[in-house]
UniProtKB/Swiss-Prot annotation:
It comes from the Eukaryota. GO terms for molecular function: identical protein binding; protein kinase activator activity; ribonucleoprotein complex binding; structural constituent of ribosome. Keywords: Phosphoprotein, Ribonucleoprotein, Ribosomal protein. GO terms for biological process: cytoplasmic translation; protein heterooligomerization; protein homooligomerization; translational elongation. Residues 85-102 have a biased composition (Acidic residues). GO terms for cellular component: cytosolic large ribosomal subunit. Phosphorylated. Belongs to the eukaryotic ribosomal protein P1/P2 family. This is Large ribosomal subunit protein P1B. The gene is RPP1B. Plays an important role in the elongation step of protein synthesis. Pfam families: Ribosomal_60s. Residues 72-84 have a biased composition (Low complexity).
């Protein structure tokens, strides 16, 4: 497991336990899990999440995901209806552009 993932999971564990996220606690959890994490990574992650509520952050992304999926679904439905019209327009253009002799042949 990567260092970043190890420290991220440790931060999530602390957030779930409603504990303050500090570099010492992050190092303790990663060490208990058998991950070798440098002090600098624990410091960086502790500073990054300082004063932030990770649970709230995660739930805000989780709540936004279905809304974007619904929008994509309606857009694909509209695209399917427009696709048939686009195919008809392409067929009309192909009919207009026939291989009539326009005087541009190389071997006339």
């Amino acid at each position: 497991m990567s260092t970043e993932a190890s420290v991220s999971y440790a931060a999530l564990i602390l957030a779930d336990a409603e504990q303050e996220i500090t570099s010492e606690k992050l190092l303790a959890i990663t060490k208990a899990a058998g991950a070798n994490v440098d002090q600098v990574w624990a410091d960086v992650f502790a500073k990054a999440v300082e004063g932030k509520n990770l649970k709230e952050l995660l739930f805000s992304f989780a709540a936004a995901a279905p809304a974007s999926g619904a929008a994509a679904g309606s857009a694909s439905g509209a695209a399917a209806g427009g696709e048939a019209a686009a195919e008809e327009a392409a067929e009309e253009e192909a009919a207009e552009e026939s291989d009539d002799d326009m005087g541009f042949g190389l071997f006339d």
